[in-house]
Amino acid sequence: METANIYRLNRDRPAASPAAPTAKPTSSPQKPKLLDQVRQAIRTRHYSYMTEKAYVGWIKRFIFFHNKRHPAEMGEAEIAQFLSALAQEKHVSASTQNQALNALLFLYHEVLGKEIGYINGVVRAKRPIRLPVVLTRQEVRSILGCLDSSDWLMVMLLYGAGLRLMECLRLRVKDIDFGANQILVRAGKGDKDRHTMLPAAVKEPLAKHLELIRRHHQRDLERGLGRVALPNALERKYPNVGKEWGWQWVFPATSHYIDKVTGERRRHHLHESVLQKAVKEAVRKAGIFKPASPHTFRNVST
C-alpha cells in the first residue's frame, strides 16, 4: 500500500532533532457584519447619527422583505420590488421612498462596491400637493406667548432669522456673533454655509440663555464630561477642542449619550421632536386651528 511505502521510507531516514514548537497561525480578524460595515462607512463620511439610523433601518427592512437574502445576491430587480411595495402597500410619501432608495444605493456603492444601474419598473410614491400653512402676525404672537424659555428662543430664531429647524438645533456658541448681529449657519441646505441676521429681540434673552448653558457646561467639565461631537476630521486633529466653550451647542440636550465609537459620554443638541411637540402644544393653547409646525414660522419670516 502507498501508506506503508511512505512509512518505510520515513523509517530509513535519520532521526531528526526535535523541531522547535511553531507558533499557531494567527487567524485573520473576522470581517465585520454587514450592518456594522454600513455604520462604519457612514461614520467615516461624517454623516449625522440621524442618517445612520435611517439608512441602517432601511437596509434591515430591505433584507427582511426579501426573506433575509444577502444584498450581495440581489440587485436592481429586488430594489425595484422593495421600493414599489413601499408605495403600494405601505403608502409612504415620496420623500420617504427616496430616502429608502438613497440608503440602498449607499449600501451597494459604498459598502458592497457594486454598481447599480437604472432601476426599472418602480411604482413611485405620489407627491402630495399641499399649500403652505401661513400664520398671521397676531397668531405668531399668540403662539409665542404660550412657549417657555428655550422653546421661545428657538421659535424666535426660526421666525426672525429664517432658520430651518435643524439649522437652529445645530447652532454652536461660536456661531453667534453678538457684535456683528450675525448668525453663522453651518452646512445648511445644499451643505453650504451662510450668514443671517441675529434678531435684536433675541439678543438679550439669548445672552442670558448662553450664560445658563455655560454654567451647565462648567459643571460637566468638573465631572470629567463636557465633550461634544465635532464636524469632519477636527476631533482627530484637535482631540481636546470638543470640550471648548465655543464648540458647545446653543441648545444642548438635557442628558448625555454614549458615543458608539469612543464609548465616551457626550452631550448632543436637542432632538427636533422637543420643539415640534412644544409648538404643537402652544398652537393648541393659543386656540389656533391650523396644522402649524416649527417650519411654519420660517414661512412667516420669508
Can you say where each PLM-predicted feature lies in the sequence?
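Conserved catalytic core of the tyrosine transesterase superfamily
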Residues: 1-302
